[in-house]
């Protein structure tokens, strides 16, 4: 992701970084700082095959691990992820996972990216409009430009704002409601 190096010099990033540093000092913010860029550390640019775009990290204690929709071993599977597993089971007969840890997906080339990379404890969408959207939009632009035949899965209204920056002549785009909205019988 060296193509993003220039982003870290831009005004929005400097302002965003300052806001995030202050938030970590004064509030409980997820994920913890060491996991903030886990999506990028887990799935290198040249290995990306699928990009799943979510909203923001889980805001419950111990849930967010820096991968969209993922939680660590031993954490109860959140309803949105359980709905994803149920859809995979219903459509493809894939057994419902006992763990919500999606690190194996990331290791296989699935970039699990939220449009907003941080959130305040128990306050969903609390870091919306701080500047993360500018950064994640740039990430998608780089992937769309540099790679080919990537499957982009856009879940929820917040994720769909990037639809227009993906080159649909080179990539595949799947848009749907947020998995939390899915109803299973």
Segments the model singles out, each with a brief description of its role:
Residues 6-154, 158-161, 166-168, 172-177:
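A polyanion-binding, active-site-adjacent surface
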């Amino acid at each position: 992701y060296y193509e993003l190096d220039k982003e870290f010099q831009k005004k929005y990033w400097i302002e965003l970084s300052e806001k995030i540093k202050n938030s970590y000092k004064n509030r409980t913010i997820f994920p913890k700082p060491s996991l903030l860029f886990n999506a990028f550390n887990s799935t290198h640019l040249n290995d990306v095959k699928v990009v799943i775009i979510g909203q923001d990290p889980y805001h419950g204690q111990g849930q967010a691990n820096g991968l969209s929709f993922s939680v660590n071993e031993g954490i109860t599977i959140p309803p949105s992820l359980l709905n994803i597993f149920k859809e995979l089971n219903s459509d493809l007969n894939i057994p419902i996972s006992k763990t919500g840890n999606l690190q194996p997906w990331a290791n296989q080339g699935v970039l699990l990216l939220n449009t907003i990379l941080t959130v305040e404890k128990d306050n969903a969408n609390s870091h919306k409009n701080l500047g993360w959207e500018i950064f994640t939009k740039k990430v998608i632009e780089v992937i769309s430009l540099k790679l080919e035949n990537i499957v982009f899965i856009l879940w929820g209204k917040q994720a769909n704002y990037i639809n227009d920056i993906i080159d649909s002549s080179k990539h595949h785009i799947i848009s749907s409601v947020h998995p939390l909205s899915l109803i299973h019988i």
